[in-house]
């Protein structure tokens, strides 16, 4: 089909296997873009809008700097995360899923409302992937480092493609300790 229709990027022919050892090998390929594997019955066909297959995503933990929040400083709902690029600019890399009440309470005491000159002043953030709706955010001082669980999937600018999952605050780290964004947004 690929040859007959002369399909090329962004189309990708995905390999398949029934061998567990092959799957384990594929799961080591995150550095070259492997996001995970999809499990399905051998005789199952793709059906739009039907959830019959399961995806196992490769995840890792990583640190990021909190630059903004949704909710209030006293009760944050989600964290907007950043990393410094090679030019020392704080760039947006992703947002967490909704925080559990206990996590929000733990973070609240570590946040300070953003001051004049915040690196994200004037920026707008989308409410979701592909959404035109703007997210209502409160800027906070980019001083708090957090550890999050993230999919290895990144977009072309280096941002996490899927929401990050809160793990913990890292008051033992400073923003300078967070890995730099290696593919800065254009």
What do these predicted ranges mean?
Residues 1-186:
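Catalytic cores of nucleic-acid ligases and guanylyltransferases
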């Amino acid at each position: 089909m690929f040859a007959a229709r002369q399909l090329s990027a962004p189309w990708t022919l995905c390999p398949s296997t029934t061998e567990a050892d092959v799957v384990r090998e594929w799961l080591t390929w995150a550095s070259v873009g492997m996001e995970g594997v999809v499990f399905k019955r051998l005789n199952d066909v793709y059906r739009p809008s039907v959830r019959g297959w399961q995806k196992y995503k490769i995840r890792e933990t990583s640190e990021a700097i909190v630059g903004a929040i949704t909710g209030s400083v006293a009760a944050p709902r989600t964290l907007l995360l950043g990393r410094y690029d090679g030019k020392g600019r704080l760039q947006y890399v992703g947002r967490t899923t909704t925080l559990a009440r206990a996590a929000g309470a733990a973070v609240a005491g570590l946040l300070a409302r953003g001051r004049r000159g915040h690196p994200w002043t004037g920026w707008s953030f989308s409410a979701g992937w592909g959404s035109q709706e703007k997210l209502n955010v409160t800027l906070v001082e980019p001083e708090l480092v957090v550890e999050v669980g993230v999919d290895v999937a990144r977009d072309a600018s280096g941002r996490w493609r899927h929401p990050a999952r809160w793990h913990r605050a890292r008051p033992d780290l400073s923003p300078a300790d967070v890995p730099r964004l290696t593919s800065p947004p254009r």
